[in-house]
C-alpha cells in the first residue's frame, strides 16, 4: 500500500486565537512528535500585530524547532474593501464569508500585503514556502500577485496549487462549520462521509479553526479523529514536504 500522509492545519493563528488553540495543541503534543501547520496572520483583524507580541513570536519559534511549519495566511484576515456590486461577489463576500481579504483586492494591493507578510517572516527568520488566503479565496489580482512572489504553493479545501502556474495536487481537506449546534452536528456527518470517500487518498488534511476549539463536541472530535487516523497508519507531515515532493516529480 502506498504511503498515506496526514496534515494537521491550524487556521487563523494569532495572539488572540492562541488561548482557543492552546489546550488542543497541548493534547496533540502529548500524543508524540506530531508536526502541525500553523496558518499565521500578521495582524489579525488589525488588532494582533505580531511585531508587538514577543511572547507569541517565541512560541512560534519553539514550534519551528519542533518541526512544525509556519504558513502566511492573509495579512489582516478581514474584508475591508468597498461593498460588493455583483450578485456573485455579494454571495462570496457576505454569505460565504466576511473574511475573504484577498478576494476583492487589486493586483497592486495584493502584492503590497503579500510583500509585507513575506518581510515579517524574514524579519523573524521564519522559513516561508506557502500562502493560504483567508477563506481560501483568491481574486484575479491576488492570483497574479501571488504567482510573482517566489513562494511555492497555495491551497484551497481540496487541493494544493504549485506556484507560479497553479498546477494542481489533490489534497482533500476535512473542515467544520462550528458556529452553531446544528452546524457542528452536520459537520460531523459530512466529515465522516468524506473520510470514507478519501480513505486511501495519498494526502489528507485536517483544517481546524479557533471556533472549533470553543466547543467540547468539535474539539474532541478533532482529537479523536487525529488519533484514529494515526492508528490507521497515516504518517503526519507538513505542507512543504508534500509540495516539494510533487514539484520534484513534475520536473523529472
Describe these PLM feature segments.
Residues 69-88:
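Short, solvent-exposed beta-strand-terminating loops
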Residues 1-69:
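Active-site beta->alpha N-cap acidic-glycine motif
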Residues 12-20, 42-55, 78, 82, ...:
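Acidic-and-aromatic substrate-binding clefts and catalytic sites of carbohydrate-active enzymes
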Residues 35-40, 153, 203, 208-252:
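C-terminal domain-boundary segment and adjacent tail
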Residues 6-10, 36-38, 70-73, 128-131, ...:
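Hydrophobic faces of well-ordered beta-strands that scaffold small-molecule active sites
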Residues 167-217:
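A conserved mid-domain beta-alpha-beta active-site/ligand-binding segment of alpha/beta enzyme cores
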Residues 84-105:
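Active-site gating loops and adjacent loop-to-helix segments of metal-dependent hydrolytic enzymes
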Residues 103-176, 214, 219:
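Catalytic domains of cell-wall/extracellular-matrix polysaccharide-remodeling enzymes
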Amino acid at each position: 500500500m502506498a504511503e498515506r500522509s496526514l496534515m494537521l492545519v491550524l487556521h487563523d493563528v494569532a495572539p488572540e486565537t492562541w488561548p482557543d488553540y492552546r489546550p488542543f495543541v497541548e493534547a496533540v503534543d502529548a500524543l508524540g512528535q506530531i508536526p502541525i501547520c500553523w496558518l499565521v496572520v500578521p495582524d489579525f483583524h488589525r488588532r494582533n500585530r505580531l511585531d508587538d507580541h514577543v511572547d507569541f513570536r517565541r512560541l512560534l519559534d519553539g514550534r519551528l524547532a519542533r518541526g512544525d511549519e509556519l504558513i502566511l495566511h492573509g495579512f489582516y484576515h478581514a474584508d475591508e474593501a468597498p461593498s460588493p456590486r455583483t450578485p456573485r461577489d455579494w454571495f462570496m463576500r457576505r454569505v460565504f464569508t466576511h473574511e475573504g481579504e484577498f478576494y476583492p483586492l487589486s493586483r497592486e494591493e495584493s502584492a503590497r500585503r503579500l510583500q509585507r507578510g513575506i518581510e515579517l517572516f524574514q524579519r523573524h527568520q521564519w522559513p516561508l514556502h506557502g500562502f493560504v488566503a483567508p477563506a481560501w479565496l483568491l481574486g484575479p489580482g491576488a492570483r497574479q500577485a501571488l504567482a510573482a512572489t517566489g513562494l511555492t504553493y497555495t491551497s484551497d479545501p481540496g487541493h494544493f496549487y504549485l506556484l507560479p502556474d497553479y498546477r494542481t495536487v489533490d489534497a482533500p481537506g476535512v473542515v467544520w462549520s462550528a458556529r452553531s449546534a446544528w452546524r457542528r452536528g452536520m459537520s460531523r456527518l459530512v466529515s465522516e462521509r468524506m473520510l470514507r470517500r478519501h480513505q486511501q487518498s495519498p494526502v489528507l488534511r485536517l483544517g481546524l479553526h479557533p471556533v472549533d476549539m470553543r466547543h467540547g463536541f468539535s474539539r474532541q472530535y478533532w482529537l479523536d479523529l487525529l488519533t484514529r487516523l494515526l492508528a490507521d497508519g497515516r504518517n503526519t507531515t507538513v505542507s512543504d514536504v508534500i509540495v516539494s515532493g510533487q514539484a520534484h516529480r513534475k520536473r523529472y
